[in-house]
Swiss-Prot record:
Gene transcribed to yield this protein: cimip2b
Name of this protein: Ciliary microtubule inner protein 2B
Protein's organism: Danio rerio
InterPro entries referenced in this protein's UniProt entry, alphabetically: CMI2A-C-like_dom
Signal peptide: none
Function: Microtubule inner protein (MIP) part of the dynein-decorated doublet microtubules (DMTs) in cilia axoneme, which is required for motile cilia beating.
């Protein structure tokens, strides 16, 4: 009876030699045997004297002496440059930073791959600096006997302890809202993407948005300057053909607003179940209950 139990169970763990599942290499007479697991079957075939084996091993253990020496020297190079506080053995997978030359190393743990890659990179950097320094020829600065280094100039003397602040002769001023600009102002327009309400803009199309809003605002300003009394007597024949049809009010009392109107409509957010035109019918003349009753009558 054994004094100490084995570390691994011979029933649960197949003893060596064996191939682990997923091995894509050749195993003699594997395709002629069935009924066992891959590990048990390969262990039986590799140890059975009845199976003819190759006189030369296909797989063999690589030497470790040179690898251990290279690993030790590379670790010393890394610690001499970055200090012993940077322990590469604790580096875990998932690091998203750049590790130079890491793509050249495979079949190792992540920490070993990073350590070898960084050590090789440091060796290459040191070799490159050594070769570059050997090609440089440093000039002798004090080759002239009477050479005196030039002294730096002292800072300028301040003319005043409390200098006056600088004021631009033509300071920039914000142009203001396009609604209140003069008709001749080149900034009287809205840029593309503006979602606010632009009066008279719904009758214009075929040009860019800044051009449309400029014409609409100019026409709206003319109507506002003319006054409400003269709006009814305003004649379209007296103006050029670019003038727009008159709309004395923004919210008509007899009809609803057109779809895609982006301005504010009192009480519209609390209504639903009808079209946009029915819900905006006489937006300023009724309460919410009166609007709903009117929408029902229209339907």
């Amino acid at each position: 009876m054994d004094l100490f139990p084995p570390k691994f169970s011979k029933v649960l763990v197949t003893p060596d030699p064996q191939y682990i599942p997923g091995y894509a290499g050749y195993c003699p007479q594997l395709k002629y045997h069935v009924g066992q697991t891959y590990g048990q079957l390969t262990a039986k075939l590799l140890t059975s004297p009845e199976v003819s084996h190759s006189q030369r091993l296909v797989l063999q253990t690589s030497p470790l002496s040179s690898t251990e020496k290279e690993t030790a020297s590379r670790s010393q190079i890394w610690w001499s440059r970055h200090g012993a506080s940077r322990n590469l053995e604790t580096m875990i997978p998932g690091y998203t930073g750049f590790v130079p030359l890491r793509q050249n190393y495979i079949c190792k743990t992540y920490a070993e791959t990073c350590r070898d890659a960084l050590s090789e990179f440091n060796q290459g950097q040191a070799k490159r600096l050594h070769n570059a320094s050997a090609d440089l020829s440093f000039p002798v600065i004090n080759s002239v006997p009477d050479f005196r280094p030039r002294r730096s100039n002292s800072p300028l003397i301040a003319l005043s302890k409390d200098p006056a602040p600088y004021k631009a002769p033509d300071p920039w001023k914000p142009p203001g809202s396009p609604y209140f600009m003069e008709d001749s102002s080149p900034h009287k327009y809205f840029i593309s993407g503006f979602t606010g309400y632009v009066p008279k803009a719904r009758f214009l199309f075929g040009t860019g948005y800044p051009t449309i809003t400029n014409k609409a605002l100019i026409q709206f300003s003319k109507e506002m300057k003319a006054g409400p009394a003269s709006l009814q007597k305003y004649s379209l024949q007296e103006e050029d053909s670019s003038n727009l049809p008159l709309i004395p009010t923004i919210y008509p009392s007899k009809t609803g607003l057109l779809p895609s109107y982006t301005g504010h409509i009192p009480g519209y957010r609390f209504q639903y179940g009808h079209t946009f035109g029915k819900l905006t019918h006489n937006a300023l003349g009724h309460t919410a209950s009166q609007k709903n009753a009117g929408a029902i009558r229209l339907s």
